[in-house]
């Protein structure tokens, strides 16, 4: 499967996904992979998302004598969903499960 096909499936997922924090909207690196039979986890196939480092800042103004700056750094993170069915391919539900895991990570 080419990277173009994986990108097309990512866009298909984006079209029907109603999650506020969909992985397909982000800037992470999405890819499809296949593991050969001789691999320790093979034969298998799946999808992987590598997120970028994310820095958020906020101010605490309540219950303090002075404003305090809070910084949160998250990432990079690698999320992988592996399928070991006998029919290798980029199944649409792999993207849905990856999106669910992405939302667990983001919350």
UniProtKB/Swiss-Prot annotation:
Question: What keyword terms does UniProt attach to this protein?
Answer: Early protein
Q: Which InterPro entries match?
A: Adeno_E3A
Any single Pfam family the record assigns to this protein: Adeno_E3A
Domain of life from the UniProt record: Viruses
- What family is this? Belongs to the adenoviridae E3A-2 family.
Indicate what this protein is called per its UniProt record: Early E3A 12.5 kDa protein
Species of origin: Human adenovirus C serotype 2 (HAdV-2)
Q: What is the lineage of its organism?
A: Viruses, Varidnaviria, Bamfordvirae, Preplasmiviricota, Tectiliviricetes
């Amino acid at each position: 499967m080419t990277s173009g096909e994986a990108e097309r499936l990512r866009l298909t997922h984006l079209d029907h996904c109603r999650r506020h924090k969909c992985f397909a909207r982000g800037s992470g690196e999405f890819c499809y992979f296949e593991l050969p039979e001789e691999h320790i986890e093979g034969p298998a196939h799946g999808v992987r998302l590598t997120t970028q480092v994310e820095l958020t800042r906020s101010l605490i103004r309540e219950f303090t004598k002075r404003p305090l700056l809070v910084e949160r750094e998250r990432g990079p993170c690698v999320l992988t969903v592996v399928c070991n069915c006998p029919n290798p391919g980029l199944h649409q539900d792999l993207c849905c499960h990856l999106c669910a895991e992405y939302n667990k990570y983001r919350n």
